[in-house]
Amino acid sequence: LGLDLVCFMQVRLQAHSEKALARFEETVRSLPAVLECHYLTGEFDYLLKTVFRNRQELEHFDRRILSPLPHVVQVLTSVVLSEIKSTTELPLPGDSA
């Protein structure tokens, strides 16, 4: 598919009302570049796992789509250099670590 640029984008919102959060989440659900979206505790409100074909697509997404969304005040992007582990297996009770 050519979507080799994987990024994690941490997003901080200015407003945290139920309406602001719902609006952000609804928008993110509609964005094909976003594979995962997690609501967090801590310094940032959301963590997005995103994929792009190249740096130009990433820049367009950041500057023209994500950052201009209402209430978004900060986006911190980390580019994945290599994937160390990816699994869908869940630890079962009684399994040793």
Residue ranges, per PLM feature:
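A compositional/biophysical signature of low hydrophobicity enriched in polar/charged and small residues
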Residues: L1-A97
